Amino acid sequence: MSHVDTEVRPSNFIRNIIDEDLKSGKHTNVQTRFPPEPNGYLHIGHAKSICLNFGIARDYQGLCNLRFDDTNPEKEDIDYVNSIQADVRWLGFQWDGEVRYSSNYFDQLHQYAVELINKGLAYVCFLNADETREYRGTLKEPGKNSPYRDTPVEENLRLFGKMRLGEFKEGECALRAKIDMASPFMCMRDPVIYRIRFAHHHQTGDKWCIYPMYDFTHCISDALEHITHSLCTLEFQDNRRLYDWVLDNLDDFQAPNRTRQYEFSRLNLEYTLMSKRKLNDLVTRKLVTGWDDPRMPTIAGLRRRGYTPASIREFCQRIGITKQENMIEAAMLDACIREELNEHAPRAMAVLRPLKVVIENYPEGQIETIQAASHPSDESMGTRELAFGREIFIDVADFREEANKQYKRLVMGKEVRLRNAYVIKAERCDKDSEGNITTVYCSYDADTLGKNPADGRKVKGVIHWVEATTAKPAQFRLYQRLFTDPNPAAAETVDEVLNPNSLEVVNGLVEASLANAPAEKAYQFEREGYFCADNKDSSADHLVFNLTVALRDSFE
């Protein structure tokens, strides 16, 4: 179950079904499961399913299992098993009991396959892959029966036994369910339920050389675990017929309150790919730095970018659960993290593109300490110490020699307030041989610390800064959307919609209070955005901050 609280319990069609099942007495408890295949890293789409399954279990005082669908050993890895568990925990959830694996049930699944053979409902087929595809037919044309479909039960038992003993080659034969080759649903045209794979399995080793297919395994695993509501995305809607057929034809699962499958729409998020294959292509071709690249939609990538468990859970609650496929605006996810960080992130000052400022009438060699609030509306976050001296750095964009009235920053001959400090006035500047401004010389009003000028003059602009001798060097990674198209999945190739400007790296300075910023610590860098300390590359010797989200939605 979850260890997190939900302010408002959401309502959706699945919860309505559960309410009715409990009211009618069909079920007296609720048991769900999250069943990922350990062949990749979880992404934001999986987070929707995690929040749904664990959230329902929590709200109905039920249980939620974590079960790995590990029936495809060639594509699976123990590293994925470990990362998925870590991601689920990080999101704030805890499964019931031990981690479960479909492979826990391989012996029972084998017995159930034998039961279907004995009932004349499964047969060993020697059609190759191309022949099987040809015999299956199309959506417009019915399939035709395999020449092996009417093999006697005793012979099928013998052949399946030989499959189990490894006496056939991979692809030489497979066990198929005997259903209906004329069914309008392709999944019901005698689907394969066991195939031969001479592959080492991360849980069972080399015990098995035949492995059950997902559609055969999934429903039986649900039933064995007494799952009351098996929640899947809409692409499994047709497969529900096979789900029910398997359980309908096995003696152990005839109870009227057995598990049922319900489908909901998967998450489609703007500017985001969810396909493991396409995401893997980005990683393999080094178009991103890895599965945890902050531009990736993986949980690891979102975490490194600075998204929090609470913001992801809030996003999943806001988008809701429906049967209708739709595209969710990326701005909604941004809003969830922006709102949370606005409330909880301490403020700090960082200068991403430093420009030196010398305050000529400030005493040389003097460094004073200014107390600044860590949060403008949360006194419980306390204060931090800012050093202030004769030399400071401001952002290069915050000074112009000439500007119109809309420019509320430092202009030659005019005043601006330094955040948490004094009012300064630009007097002159130095330039290099190419005309670039290198230093701005200012004067300051010593009687303006924490108050307006005594003579009542108005100073409208406020800019951020850092003190030159105490500021810490830092790298800032400024992330934008990885794709230029709101629907990158529709593009013929990923390359044509890849954003060449999705990452800009700049080197600047942060105030001294951030010298030991812990990994994943979030800050609002005033006037810049919300950032977090990178959880891989940042250290006291080399500070690295990732842009999580802008202060406001630039896509509005």
Swiss-Prot record:
Location(s), subcellular: Cytoplasm
Main location (coarse class): cytoplasm
Record bears the keyword Protein biosynthesis: yes
Protein residues bound to ATP: 37-39, 43-49, 233, 266-267, 274-276
Residue window of motif 'HIGH' region: 36-46
Enzyme nomenclature, EC number: 6.1.1.18
Keywords, comma-separated and alphabetical: Aminoacyl-tRNA synthetase, ATP-binding, Cytoplasm, Ligase, Nucleotide-binding, Protein biosynthesis
Catalytic activity: tRNA(Gln) + L-glutamine + ATP = L-glutaminyl-tRNA(Gln) + AMP + diphosphate
Gene Ontology cellular component terms for the protein in this record: cytosol
Family, as annotated: Belongs to the class-I aminoacyl-tRNA synthetase family.
Protein known as: Glutamine--tRNA ligase
The gene coding this protein: glnS
